């Protein structure tokens, strides 16, 4: 997973099920869209706002016409449903993604590197 660069995006991801979709990167799945069309392809990227970038896509519109596309960007607002593949262990996928986020948040160990949330000096 490419970890989100902003603190806001990482916070949104770890406090929602977006983290599960981010764990599906590299897998082939189907995304149902609000306009009743369907996109089937490999998930390349999912950001904290559920924007999804798919590769090698078969796009089917609501009338059943199919188009093959190299890539497709779907805004989170247009996503109705993302099909989770049967072979995905949901619990372990979420735990792996949380570990990645916490590794980025705490990189460098204690007293090293940068702090995203430096401790406040209480007096």
From Swiss-Prot:
SMART domains: Sm. Its main location: nucleus. InterPro entries: LSM_dom_sf, Sm, Sm_dom_euk/arc, U7_snRNA_Sm-like. It is found in: Nucleus. Residues 16-88 form the Sm domain. Signal peptide: none annotated. One of its GO terms (biological process) is RNA splicing. SUPFAM superfamilies: Sm-like ribonucleoproteins. Keywords: mRNA processing, mRNA splicing, Nucleus, Ribonucleoprotein, RNA-binding. GO terms for cellular component: Cajal body; cytoplasmic U snRNP body; nuclear body; nucleoplasm; U7 snRNP. Not methylated. Methylation is not necessary for interaction with SMN. Gene3D superfamilies: 2.30.30.100. Belongs to the snRNP Sm proteins family. Appears to function in the U7 snRNP complex that is involved in histone 3'-end processing. Increases U7 snRNA levels but not histone 3'-end pre-mRNA processing activity, when overexpressed. Required for cell cycle progression from G1 to S phases. Binds specifically to U7 snRNA. Binds to the downstream cleavage product (DCP) of histone pre-mRNA in a U7 snRNP dependent manner. This is U7 snRNA-associated Sm-like protein LSm10. It comes from Homo sapiens. The lineage of its organism: Eukaryota, Metazoa, Chordata, Craniata, Vertebrata.
């Amino acid at each position: 997973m490419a970890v989100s660069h902003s603190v806001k995006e990482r916070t949104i991801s770890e406090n929602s099920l977006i983290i599960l979709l981010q764990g599906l990167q590299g897998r082939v799945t189907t995304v149902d869209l609000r306009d009743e069309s369907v996109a089937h392809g490999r998930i390349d990227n999912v950001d904290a706002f559920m924007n999804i970038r798919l590769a090698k896509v078969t796009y089917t519109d609501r009338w059943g016409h199919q188009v093959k596309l190299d890539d497709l960007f779907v805004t989170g607002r247009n996503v109705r449903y993302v099909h989770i593949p049967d072979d995905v262990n949901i619990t372990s996928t979420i735990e792996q993604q949380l570990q990645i986020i916490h590794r980025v948040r705490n990189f460098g160990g204690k007293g090293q590197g940068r702090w995203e949330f430096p401790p406040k000096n209480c007096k």
